[in-house]
Swiss-Prot record:
GO terms for cellular component: endoplasmic reticulum membrane; GET complex. Keywords: Coiled coil, Endoplasmic reticulum, Membrane, Transmembrane, Transmembrane helix, Transport. Required for the post-translational delivery of tail-anchored (TA) proteins to the endoplasmic reticulum. Acts as a membrane receptor for soluble GET3, which recognizes and selectively binds the transmembrane domain of TA proteins in the cytosol. This is Protein GET1. Interacts with GET3. Belongs to the WRB/GET1 family. GO terms for biological process: tail-anchored membrane protein insertion into ER membrane. It is found in: Endoplasmic reticulum membrane. It is a multi-pass membrane protein. Gene3D superfamilies: Helix hairpin bin (1.10.287.660). The keyword GTP-binding does not apply.
Amino acid sequence: MPSLLIIVLIIHVVTYLINTIGANTIDSLLWLLYLKLPNQTSQTANEQRRLKREVMQLKREMNATSSQDEFAKWAKLRRRHDKTMEEYEAKNKALGKHKSSFDLAVKSIRFFSTTGLKLFLQFWCSKTPIFELPRGWIPWQVEWVLSFPRAPLGTVSIQIWGGVCATVVSLAGDAIGVVNVYLTSKAPKQKEPATSGENSARPMAIKKEL
């Protein structure tokens, strides 16, 4: 089993990545991946997309058909359009319910695996030291702060270690972002080819000089 030190660090790394990428972006990506799986929801989504294409096709055919000159054909298209539209709305409503349930499940898993787990560990392991400090290296006042609130004196508590992890992960993420921006700005740019106007102007300038 991984140590408490590593578990707390991983929780803060995952939390930082979720906040950086965006929870809504992750939810949308997971929903798209879920629809790729062979399940009832993916079948409903495929049927919904098929009905949407059919509704649009029937709409175009209705617009291209005169309701006065070709009333029988137009009325037949209208009935097909209304029936298909009703089926599409039913599938769309069912898919919306599936997505709401999926989003709720994803949000619950994300909360309990990050914030919920962090709060539980801080409560359950409040007396468990993350690691011990060398004796006599720092004043006892500092040892008391590092062991706050309930860890043994001379050790680092899970609350203090969690704060350190959050700060270090945030600084590391900012540093990586700065390095990425720097490398992107220093990337060699392709030389733009000279325009035809510039090429034609050069011989004329040479002739004038001669």
